[in-house]
Amino acid sequence: MVRSCLSIVLSAGEGTRMKSPLPKVLHKIAGLPLICHVLKQIELAESSQVAVVVGCGGQEVTHVVQSFVKDVMIFEQKERLGTAHAVLSARFALQKGVDDILIVFGDTPLIQQESLHQMRAQLADGADVVFAGFHTQDPTGYGRLLEKNGQLIAIVEEKDASEEEKKISFCNGGILAMRGKHALSLLEKVDNNNMKKEYYLTDIASLASREGLDVRVVEVPFENIVGINNCLELSRADSLWQKRKARDLMLSGVTLLKPETVYFSYDTEIEPGVVIEPNVYFGLGVKVQSGAVIRAFSYLEGAVVGQDAQIGPYARLRPGTELAKSVKVGNFCEVKQAKVGESSKINHLSYIGDAEIGAHTNIGAGTITCNYDGFNKYKTVIGDHAFVGSNTALVSPLVIGDGSYVASGSVITENIPMNSMAFGRARQVIKEGYATKFRARLLEKNLSENKQKK
């Protein structure tokens, strides 16, 4: 029998240590807001219902969450009175009678579905309450997990821990799972008899233990539950995410020559057999097919790179770029909102924007599509087996037919029929011996000007 599950994401914290007007959970790792990383893993853990508790920046957080997850419930914690109080802000959702309750924090972007599945498995096995825990050589600052006979009996915050308890290296990971039938009753028994006068979610451990409930701990890797409180921790978490992504790609058959220098986005898709050189950036929406080579210092976003294509070095692919099989885009080229056909080449110093290029076409060095008049964008269409010479300006809207040649240095403003040759430049004029006369004239002029100054 499939167990129903309500996941509650706590994201009401003010995040003052981020020192940013942006709500903490909307800061990004790999191009995706922190809270969306959490929501993604919750979905993979087969949550049937999702609730998000918002506070500071609630409207912004709500907008992002609702655009990322369908049918999400939003609740506001109007007063910051602790984590248990935050969960009770979602009382309406807690009353729906689900089998499992998962409670996670919106600033833990490295959480993994496997950990959530493990905690739910403990509930299915008979546990009433399950906390996530982790071992660390330096437990300073973390709540300690106190166990007895294999059961969790309490979570003691460091400021309240005895010297003996401070030696415990098993710490609270911040994720909580409960049977739905116990959730409200336990939460309502949490009091605020502490220095901060707040209602702590961790008190549920001792409350449940005293009631004779089955309280367990699932050990998870520390990196899976890392929380974000400032921009330094954000950077460290991003680095952990990047290492994880690079490892997964290399194990799948992708060659990364210097993985620590490559930056991936959360939705980057790279097929086996791809080779990626150092210092490459993958923005949102990039797909790279097998056999492609992405050379050093290239920047890709919103682009599809076809099989056996070669990109870079120093190439930029912008959103809307679609490169077919064996396309070459070389150094200092920028391609935007353009489709490039099989085996076509854009090898040097070119800008191709709002264009469609056929197969087996060569775009010479310094070619520019002039696609913008200050108000509107216009399209350039170049057929199959065409040749565009170096230092050419293509003023769109423009169609260049199959098999046509464009002479180097041309400014092309009119359509070119197929198998034609177009020249769009002034004829070269040679005046033999004129350079000597020209230099003499310039020298005479300079001497005259110098005399006038004196």
UniProtKB/Swiss-Prot annotation:
UniProt-annotated catalytic positions: H348 (proton acceptor)
Stretches for region N-acetyltransferase: 253-454
Enzymatic class: transferase
Keyword Secreted: no
Keyword Nucleotidyltransferase: yes
EC number, UniProt record: 2.7.7.23, 2.3.1.157
Keywords from the named record: Acyltransferase, Cell shape, Cell wall biogenesis/degradation, Cytoplasm, Magnesium, Metal-binding, Multifunctional enzyme, Nucleotidyltransferase, Peptidoglycan synthesis, Repeat, Transferase
Protein name per UniProt: Bifunctional protein GlmU
Species this protein is from: Bartonella tribocorum (strain CIP 105476 / IBS 506)
Name of encoding gene: glmU
